[in-house]
């Protein structure tokens, strides 16, 4: 057994152990007071790196959720604005429907047109002023916008909102068969009285659709009226609607004279004696209308005193009379009625409520005036056009001109908006087209909103899981750490006692000196 005074190994050992115990005790107290297992890199360097990455991811996910909520707010702002625009369009169509009946006077139609123009101003005002955080939403500039919805770059959702101003919506494409070819004027050889089958090309951008053939003749259930009926029966598939106007009009007012051997659509009317100029006493129109239930043709006089023969159901109109009788009718469509095969087919109008071209081919389609070489009347309008005049081009493409005489009457157009019957019909189509366009935009935005909501739900769950993972690494387990604290506290106290005893052991050396 050896005794040393200069170096107290036991005391040094007790001191070293005591320092470590105090360090552990301090660390345990720090963890208990902060609630964190990792307070500094030395506590768990690799764990801290992982926990910091998870904390960053959680914070970024939280911002992504806020971004998605901002995007939802923008989409909802635009959606509510367009909802108001659709209500305006519904009102415009209601007023157009109100104007589309000849019980209205020109003044009452002008009043309706004035209301519609005010409504269009408000529709454009909504399109130009709806904004979110200074960004215009409905002017067309909100295109291909991206929203970061993830913790890492390029995790985005894209959204675009087209323009909803009146000059960008409400497109209507109108095409009406030629009124200089066989589809309109009399055909002396009657080669246009035949079977016609139309083929609508690239209806949905890809497919062609062929409809059943229709006989063009003067019999009931035939003619472009029957053709129009078939087209409308499948309008949802073909993407177009059809209307027709079969009318023969004199080139000048009715002249005085006698009409001999008058036959219309195979029904013999006979001789009409002493017809007065302008058919002043109505004997010519009365004679024709007395058999209209058999001919399907109704006669009337226009404001200029010209006779109009109108096909009630869209069958062709065949008129025959003895030589020189055509002069009494005033020429025009009746210039050749002394021939044996004189017929008027009429004009077929196709309308599509968007801006795409209408492409037609088929069997004998030129016989109803739809060959491009025949000069098909075609025009595309948008909702803004309601503010102006529907000019002669619009009138012809919309089918307002049944023949050359009517085209001359409408050479300056058909007036503004709903101030005419045909104009009111066009405005109705425009309102439908505009509403469809807005509904498509709203549908797209609804899909974006649903995507954002789903994203928020997913990110929220992910954020919770990331937070849980971070907590598992960073946060302290109080039960475990309390046990550690008790251990370190006892060790610290016992260490102090041991150090005191180690120092006291050196006193034993004095006994050797006594």
Swiss-Prot record:
Membrane-spanning intervals of the chain: none
InterPro entries (alphabetical): Flagellin, Flagellin_C, Flagellin_C_sub2, Flagellin_hook_IN_motif, Flagellin_N
Alphabetical UniProt keywords: Bacterial flagellum, Secreted, Virulence
Intracellular or extracellular location(s): Secreted; Bacterial flagellum
Chief localisation class: secreted
GO cellular component: bacterial-type flagellum; extracellular region
Pfam families in the record: Flagellin_C, Flagellin_IN, Flagellin_N
Any one GO MF annotation of this record: structural molecule activity
Function: Flagellin is the subunit protein which polymerizes to form the filaments of bacterial flagella. Important for motility and virulence.
Subunit structure: Heteromer of FlaA and FlaB. FlaB is located proximal to the hook while the remainder of the filament is composed of the predominant FlaA.
Annotated family: Belongs to the bacterial flagellin family.
Name the record gives this protein: Flagellin B
Organism (species): Helicobacter pylori (strain J99 / ATCC 700824) (Campylobacter pylori J99)
